[in-house]
């Protein structure tokens, strides 16, 4: 039988050495599922609540024993007896049990751990891969990866404001080849950094965190690495993306983007209009295909102006702006702000709500990018979600650190399992951009 008989959570560590949750779900048949919960460093103001203990004498206040107790003593009692295949009913039951708009009572981390474990247990019961269980028979698209090879902002100690400099192998024929291209550029970049006497230590997401002279220096160095690895920059090869994480350096009182927060005294201070001009300047100068959080999460006028200026040429991804929430996404669609949503399961807290956000985005002609968090685990669920939803894009870090590679390796397995059915769309993943042949 597929009936849930036990739910158990424990406290484990994430890739930063901070506590997080691992949840296990058991059924009468012996089918079993386990889910682990990621955590972000730069978090959106409107994200669902990640419940922490606040006890400074233990893990600096970051313990998750309250969330663990909520799973073991509250959620377990509520969902034991459910059919493990009834994902939506279980997720809705947990949302109702919490009763708050931001999951602040039980904790989104507690709810998400259960949601993932339930899905994995259902797949185990049906003896099918997780991506097949979640996506059905039409599952076939391997995502084009966003590879974060330079870390800045809140993800490193490097004096550069933009949080991520990414490469996307849009011209590769398969996911396996895309991964190889990215790995070779990553190693070429390491060699170039060493030759310049720059640091090759890696940040939270596995990218390098050197002391560049500025944003342009970072981009120019990546372009050299692409060439050194034997590839070309552009639509037939490898393109570049940014996660500006602009909310991290936006000064709401002064209404300016203050780069000096990360770059020191020489950092620019830009108004919203100047921020848009600067991003357009970068797009005109370099082969940039995607920009995430180019404006502050509450700067709706700025987002609309940025979209009007660049929305036909560049993917403009809302992360902190949308926080995987259909209410914010619906407003963005209505006001024509952004043209893509970043999907982070722990921003919203259940797989059901995650899938609803992806579906809403697609129906509106927005792209959806399935994403990791800076604090990750060996859990590879997001790889399965990316394929299950045919999202077409995934953002899961650089080509180092096992917590990042776990997702890439799972995608390699899935591509093998799908065989001739597997599709890698590359540049066609950006189906809502003029430059991609719409």
From Swiss-Prot:
Superkingdom assignment: Bacteria
Function: Catalyzes the reversible conversion of 2-phosphoglycerate (2-PG) into phosphoenolpyruvate (PEP). It is essential for the degradation of carbohydrates via glycolysis.
Binding-site positions, Mg(2+): 243, 292, 319
Compartment list: Cytoplasm; Secreted; Cell surface
Protein family (similarity comment): Belongs to the enolase family.
Cofactors: Mg(2+)
GO molecular function: magnesium ion binding; phosphopyruvate hydratase activity
UniProt-recorded name of the protein: Enolase
Enzyme class: lyase
UniProt cross-references to NCBIfam families, sorted A to Z: eno
Cofactor binding note of this UniProt entry: Binds a second Mg(2+) ion via substrate during catalysis.
Active site: 205 (proton donor), 344 (proton acceptor)
Binding site for (2R)-2-phosphoglycerate: 163, 344, 373-374, 395
Keyword terms: Cytoplasm, Glycolysis, Lyase, Magnesium, Metal-binding, Secreted
Organism: Streptococcus agalactiae
InterPro entries: Enolase (IPR000941), Enolase-like_C_sf (IPR036849), Enolase-like_N (IPR029017), Enolase_C (IPR020810), Enolase_CS (IPR020809), Enolase_N (IPR020811)
Pathway: Carbohydrate degradation; glycolysis; pyruvate from D-glyceraldehyde 3-phosphate: step 4/5
Example GO biological process: glycolytic process
EC number: 4.2.1.11
